[in-house]
């Protein structure tokens, strides 16, 4: 299988392209969070359902050659590598420094009278550090929903409320799987608050809104993409374990024009240490907040994972010996705040189922739509991915 870094970049970009078909404004989500949830589902699926989910973790080239050997045993052996990567990644993340908070938490809420296979529960604990909490969906669906929502709220510093809205959980719900990513980090070099000024952010050539524009001049990892007429800048957090990358086109309306010229592989290449160089940069970055929620079943089905959500096709025989289990809901909510001190970001996935320019400095003036993502540098995994286009 591909590395978690490559997979999270690919899923992040593919999912972004799907979401932007129906979202004109800001977009923000956690590729690693969504992948973790898919991994936990994959652990309990078999047959064609498992094969579809497994394709997410392989490049197209790999997938074509592996389709020939879709024997059940081999699929299970193959997927073990996927789960081991998550185990390693989640263990690494849990050991990170005290300079910021980064928590990835998984939990299963299961109907207390429904029998889940012990083997599944053991594996999901082993690989994903997730335990099963029995709840009474049959007699107390709404209380159970509120209980799950308050758990998510407590784990995201109260940034994500009501992950599961009214009516999303019923007495027939058997299992709710929740993944939660919370990050609060400080920049390696904070922006001085006294340099933050009100400025216009251009959503397009004729429409602007006021933003609080933060400014600093320093050395940053930088690359100019000549053929795209765009710049990429890496802004490190304390200790350099994590960085935010910003991809800013030169033109106000340049982002839409270049999206189709960007691929996940190119994003990895452009932001690799060998490709970027340290340059003196005048950076102007808006202070911003984005909060977003998505119902992902249709989006993931469009990306080839439809069987997991189909009552008639889903095969969850690795999770339960009972029949009829399938994922009814795949909800994902996320929040990010970017300030002078740093970034606060959270995401939860639920399956219910003015500085004057000095000579020689590069100017990166983020006063029009840009892409941004937050990456764990050691594993190259994309924790969060977004587009900021509307203050």
From Swiss-Prot:
Keywords: Cytoplasm, Protease inhibitor, Serine protease inhibitor. It comes from the Eukaryota. GO terms for cellular component: cytoplasm; cytosol; extracellular exosome; extracellular space; lysosomal lumen; nuclear speck; nucleoplasm. One of its GO terms (biological process) is regulation of proteolysis. InterPro entries: Serpin_CS (IPR023795), Serpin_dom (IPR023796), Serpin_fam (IPR000215), Serpin_sf (IPR036186), Serpin_sf_1 (IPR042178), Serpin_sf_2 (IPR042185). SMART domains: SERPIN. It is found in: Cytoplasm. GO terms for molecular function: cysteine-type endopeptidase inhibitor activity; protease binding; serine-type endopeptidase inhibitor activity. The record marks 356-357 as: Reactive bond. It holds the Pfam family Serpin. Skin specific. May play a role in the proliferation or differentiation of keratinocytes. Belongs to the serpin family. Ov-serpin subfamily. This is Serpin B13. The lineage of its organism: Eukaryota, Metazoa, Chordata, Craniata, Vertebrata.
